[in-house]
Amino acid sequence: MEKSGYGNDGIYRSLRPPVLFPNDPNLSVTSYLFQRSDAYPDRLALADANSGETLNFAQFKAMVQRVSHGLSRLGIKKGDVVLIFSPNSIYFPVCFLAIVALGAVVTTGNPQYTSAEITKQANDSKPKLVITVPQLWDKVNHLGLPAVFLGSKISGDGTIAPSNRNINGTVTYFSNLVELGGHVSEFPPVSIKRSDIAALLYSSGTSGTSKGVILTHRNLISTACMTTSDQEFDGEDPNVFLCFLPMSHVFGLVIICYSQLMRGNSVVSVEKFDLEMVLRSVGKYRVTYLCVVPPVMIALAKQNWGKIYDLSSLKRIICGSAPLGKEVIEECAKNYPHVPIIQGYGLTESCGIASLEIPEGVREYGSSGILFPAVEAKIVHVENLTPLPPNQLGEIWIRGPNMMQGYLNNPQATKLTIDEQGWVHTGDLGYFNGEGRLSVVDRIKELIKCKGFQVAPAELEGLLLSHQEILDAVVIPYPDAEAGEVPIAYVVRALSSTLDEEAVKKFIAEQVAPFKRLRKVTFVNSVPKSASGKILRRELIAKVRSKI
């Protein structure tokens, strides 16, 4: 094997030390976490920066046990799907672990989703129960599902939660759910195998329809072992992670919450991103690891916040979701010289991880680091599919124990993404250098990455074409300093139409989450297409960028 990790078989292998994975076939996500935590019952597990509430590991375990029994008494059983549609709180991971302890399956919804978006996901995943908050109830009430409301009967903004006359179905408040669970000291007796499904996390596809990524207990346990391996090899003391990234997303739920709690680290929950609250919380809770997305890095680069807030506890800033510009990294390094900035690469289909930089040694701008232990990769020629050696650009394929089992109810998409040898075809273009560092340079997929979220152009195009005065439309990414990319549209109007830009923007804004809203609309006579009718999206992107 070369210094790059490249072998004669065309496969790149991890240069990190190997990880020992648990081999008990009957291990669940929940049992694995708590069999380890019994050694440190008094250590802080979860803190809520918004409410000030805290749970040590003993309290955390007891609450998960009670909630799992409570859910069982509500009729949730092995194989059932439960939707968590809520902002971040310490009760999000409690509910997640309680659900999977029953052998049931968690699916999550971004709180920014519209009613139509969450309905599509519910129609696909068919949940038996929704766990939400009063402020989001109007978006899911029509589903007619029994619900659990997190928090007290007074909602977070001081208003009374919806009364029964507004509720279509049965609502149980979280405090009542805990009481329903009773005073128990064991988890419900359910037979769970590592091969059982634990989570359905939705990932946008280029088809414009969001797809349920099937992740097993083995996937999540393996990911946790891999994610925390650097801390273990370096012999680090227990760390404190701040989680303001949505727990509805693989980064927040699996990489931060589950993986770090599994190691015995503490997780501080922030309901939603507010830079000054995040920075205050770093000092208050002595946060050592800060996980961010590029827009937050840009905010950190603009000002030396360390002069205003106590950031002395920080040991690492980890940035995922999209590559960072050289200027942003340099400014952050200048502002926070004691904190290495670590970039990584992953996707929902790989439980959020594939590669990560190592803080020590020479840094390379734009690199996403080296492969995690047990992850293999290929760089494949996009036309003839032959494996490529270092410093040659091709599609990134990855394989490992963290890779999804497929897409829910979508065998065709599964077959296109995972081949018979278990390789996940990422749709991303990249290359490894001679030292085994991966650089991701473009996406074959046409997803737009806006503020760390995925936006499918085809979804927005479908909505545009549903307007009776729009004949044709194309949506492309446009570079943005704050968001990374934003969606913009080129629209062909009907001859008699008087539509203007604001009307089109409003039409879309009323139907989608804020991060999917169009930032610009340009009216054109035609959309560039190939002879077969396929939109020539890349040509349009290149043309637009040449004018920037």
Curated annotation (Swiss-Prot):
Gene3D superfamilies: 3.30.300.30, N-terminal domain of ligase-like. Disruption phenotype: Strongly reduced piperine content in fruits. GO terms for cellular component: peroxisome. A motif (Microbody targeting signal) lies at residues 546-548. GO terms for molecular function: ATP binding; CoA-ligase activity; long-chain fatty acid-CoA ligase activity. It is an enzyme of class 6 (ligase). ATP binds at residues 203-207, 211, 343-344, 348, 428, 440-443, 534. It is found in: Peroxisome. Its EC number is 6.2.1.-. It catalyses: a carboxylate + ATP + CoA = an acyl-CoA + AMP + diphosphate; (E,E)-piperate + ATP + CoA = (E,E)-piperoyl-CoA + AMP + diphosphate; (E,E)-piperate + ATP + H(+) = (E,E)-piperoyl-AMP + diphosphate; (E,E)-piperoyl-AMP + CoA = (E,E)-piperoyl-CoA + AMP + H(+). Residues 344-407 are annotated as: SBD2. Pathway: Aromatic compound metabolism. InterPro entries: AMP-bd_C, AMP-bd_C_sf, AMP-binding_CS, AMP-dep_synth/lig_dom, ANL_N_sf. Keywords: ATP-binding, Ligase, Nucleotide-binding, Peroxisome. Involved in the biosynthesis of aromatic piperamides natural products such as piperine (1-piperoyl-piperidine), the pungent principle contributing, together with several terpenoids, to the aromatic properties of black pepper fruits, and displaying numerous pharmacological activities such as antiproliferative, antitumor, antiangiogenesis, antioxidant, antidiabetic, antiobesity, cardioprotective, antimicrobial, antiaging, and immunomodulatory effects. Acts as a carboxylate--CoA ligase that catalyzes exclusively the formation of piperoyl--CoA from piperic acid and CoA. Monomer. Belongs to the ATP-dependent AMP-binding enzyme family. This is Piperic acid--CoA ligase. It comes from Piper nigrum.
